[in-house]
């Protein structure tokens, strides 16, 4: 697939990403195949008719999104197209969202959270900042592990964590491709690796939990201290390293492999290589949730129904997001498997441990590192 781009794989998609909070504009985007979930409902996603009516009466929805902007804007645009509900959206990292709603303490400035790994969602859940809701479309989830035991977040995709690298630069430097996490602490990679900020990025929290689950708490923290010696920069968002590899700024990155596919296929950066860790890949569950105290509760509930339908998630691969989908009536991204990703060939990630301890683990890591320095980016 050396010359394959999304332009000839899916066709051209045009979505304009806004700055700050922006209104989504109407689009005739293809919403993908749909399966009716309720023969008594004419709704496009199978949501209850009374919920649709109440949501339309509210007429507005504010979304904090932690997935990539192209996909985020596409799903917001389509929601407005389906229901005529005004949608405002702001792209923030998961860490930024978690910090913001904690500060707002039950009086959130947005209604729903969409995208980003569940580790920060679980921290917010443990603080009572997410609203419980049992959507009809949760029946389409392929496993109970893709929803919160508190019924306050629901999975929309599954992404594989791995190693990304600049093929051309490693060849120029006469360096081997790192095959596993432990290879990354080899001094020969000093100054060549980018990761993401443990305080702001959900991907970084996934990295912490992954190495602690692999090596144990103390050895896991020590691993991250050793890794830090080779890190040139910690980006605000988890997708930062993959973007920097594509542009040639970074040689090796730790991040989500679907972000690497986006760089190869959509941005045509053929220098990007993907490595699934030889000791076993970790993974994220990307989620969506309603904020406790949302000003537009019915529109928020309708959003959750929509997010768990093909009308929403089938837009992912048409807009540069190649994560595996976690509902049974969605169309899986074939391109991800063509690049060697397998949603089933992953470690047994302990979500319960991550839910209970992520916040403390972040504190432990930052304390071991002596606090952040200029490499830890917040913008």
Predicted segments, located by residue:
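N-terminal secretory signal peptides and thylakoid transit peptides that target proteins
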Residues: 1-16
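Extracytoplasmic ligand-binding site segments that recognize negatively charged/polar headgroups
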Residues: 62-76, 88-104, 108-249
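A ligand-binding cleft/hinge motif common to bilobed small-molecule-binding domains
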Residues: 119-123, 251-271
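Short beta-strand->loop
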Residues: 130-140, 152-154, 182, 265-266, ...
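Periplasmic-binding protein-like
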Residues: 143, 159, 223-228, 234-235, ...
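Mature extracytoplasmic/periplasmic domains
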Residues: 282-349
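Conserved C-terminal helix/tail region of periplasmic/extracytoplasmic solute-binding proteins
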Residues: 341-379
């Amino acid at each position: 697939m050396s010359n394959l781009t999304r332009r000839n794989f899916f066709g051209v998609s045009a979505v304009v990403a806004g700055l700050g909070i922006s209104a989504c504009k109407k689009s005739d985007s293809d919403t993908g195949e749909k399966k009716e979930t309720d023969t008594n409902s004419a709704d496009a996603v199978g949501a209850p008719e009374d919920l649709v009516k109440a949501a339309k009466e509210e007429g507005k929805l504010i979304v904090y999104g932690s997935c990539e902007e192209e996909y985020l804007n596409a799903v917001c645009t389509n929601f407005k197209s389906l229901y005529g509900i005004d949608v405002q959206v702001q792209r923030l990292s998961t860490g930024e969202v978690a910090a913001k709603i904690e500060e707002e303490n039950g009086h959130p400035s947005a209604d729903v959270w969409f995208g980003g790994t569940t580790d920060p969602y679980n921290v917010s859940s443990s603080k009572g900042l997410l609203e419980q809701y049992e959507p009809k479309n949760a029946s389409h989830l392929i496993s109970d592990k893709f929803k919160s035991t508190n019924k306050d977040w629901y999975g929309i995709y599954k992404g594989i964590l791995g190693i990304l690298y600049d093929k051309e630069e490693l060849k120029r430097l006469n360096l081997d491709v790192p095959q596993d996490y432990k290879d990354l602490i080899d001094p020969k990679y000093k100054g060549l690796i980018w990761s993401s900020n443990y305080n702001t990025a959900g991907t970084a929290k996934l990295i912490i939990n992954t190495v602690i689950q692999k090596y144990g708490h103390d050895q896991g923290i020590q691993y991250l201290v050793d890794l830090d010696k080779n890190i040139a920069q910690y980006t605000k968002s988890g997708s930062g390293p993959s973007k920097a590899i594509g542009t040639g700024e970074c040689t090796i990155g730790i991040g989500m492999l679907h972000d690497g596919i986006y760089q190869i296929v959509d941005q045509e950066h053929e220098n990007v290589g993907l490595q699934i860790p030889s000791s076993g890949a970790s993974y994220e569950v990307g989620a969506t949730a309603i904020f406790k105290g949302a000003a537009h509760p019915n529109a928020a509930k309708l959003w959750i129904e929509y997010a768990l339908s093909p009308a929403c998630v089938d837009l992912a691969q048409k807009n540069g997001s190649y994560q595996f989908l976690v509902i049974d009536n969605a169309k899986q991204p074939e391109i991800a498997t063509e690049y060697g990703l397998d949603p089933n060939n992953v470690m047994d990630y302990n979500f319960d441990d991550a839910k209970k301890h992520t916040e403390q683990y972040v504190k432990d890591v930052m304390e071991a590192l002596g606090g952040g320095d200029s490499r830890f980016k917040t913008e």
